[in-house]
């Protein structure tokens, strides 16, 4: 297995919708759109001592994805950066860390597919875990390219 469990992750704090919570308490509602119908956008970020790789590109993609899905109450890039910094600082992380940054449409007032049921705004989750790099790029990586090509939409 390329990814291994790190026992240090047992006691991490996770940012869920403005609160830093212990791993065992970090949960979203069963009425959250990510649970109801998989409605969320996410980015995977890698932390090195020099900083987060392609930080602004990740945040732009997250924002653009949320806008494309017509999310309401999207946190600003500065608000997201603040949540990431708070999470990393609270866990003493500055290297060998992977962040799963997730933005959901938020909690619904009742179950259903209609996005108008989302009345509380987006839910931001910052899950930072101690993880070594998965790929050793000095050896190259194996890639498979599909023979199927999609044309550019008109």
Language-model segment annotations:
Residues 1-154:
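Conserved alpha/beta cores of soluble small-molecule-handling proteins
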